[in-house]
Amino acid sequence: VGSEMCIRDRCMAAAKLANADTFIKHLPDGYNTMLTGDGTNLSQGQRQLLAIARAAVADPPVLILDEATSSIDTRTEKLVQDGMDGLMYGRTTFVIAHRLSTVRNSDCIMVLEQGRIIERGTHDELIAQKGRYYRLYTGNFAENS
């Protein structure tokens, strides 16, 4: 029983870190709700939040996140981004993204074109260079911030 309680506490802490706790509590049976194997009874955003929670439970030293905020609305993107920020804290993380909001706070951003690194730096450094990242950022993101 003690071990089960530790696992439950760890899962709940991970869900809170991932911003999944609120929607989980609103599921028919809360944390005891059975999900379909392919997650079709959840929204895309809810599936993303659960993926972040699962990663938090696994506690890996390195994360690889591939398009973590794709296919979700802007409101949910904020929840996912906040959850990812909590998950990434203190870890080496590789983020593959087209939505530049996902990488803006990264220590190092690498811009790839046809499989080659064409620019590298922080957000501010890349903006100052006024290269490809700058054009992508001002064209795709600046109007939304």
Write out the residue ranges for each language-model feature.
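ABC-family ATPase nucleotide-binding domain "signature/switch" substructure
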Residues: 3, 11-20, 30-130
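C-terminal boundary and immediately downstream tail of ABC-type ATPase nucleotide-binding domains
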Residues: 128-145
